[in-house]
């Protein structure tokens, strides 16, 4: 049994290494060539919403020297092993309705020259490709997109701008996900901020 497991793991490791060498690296090299050679870069993302927001620092950094267009694909099926009963879009990453709600926010970002729903436009960088990388997806990371583009944005800089809203002037807004919650957090510490 020990020998079987050793051979299985060795074969699996070899297979992953070949996949990395023959599939992942060439694709990342394609992305790099687009970045080096083009003045306008088109990006594709199909979500989740948080993943799209996480891609913005990388796009913003590239926008310093490029015109950046972002296309968002609707109704891309989530693989069966990753479907969550709590996911707001069911068995797809993003519904068309979700995208239509997100696009006005994205259009306010000055570094995005164009934001549209994907309808077979030519794509230079598929931001969904991070899902092909051999990384842990249980950890939500803005840095996934650096692996695809070779760019490393300063995450202390603002990358999502919204107009101020007087309604929430003296409010603390907490963003929570149905899939990722920490029931150990006691929010009573926020009471010290009450004016």
Predicted regions and their residues:
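Catalytic machinery of carbohydrate-active enzymes
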Residues: 1-195
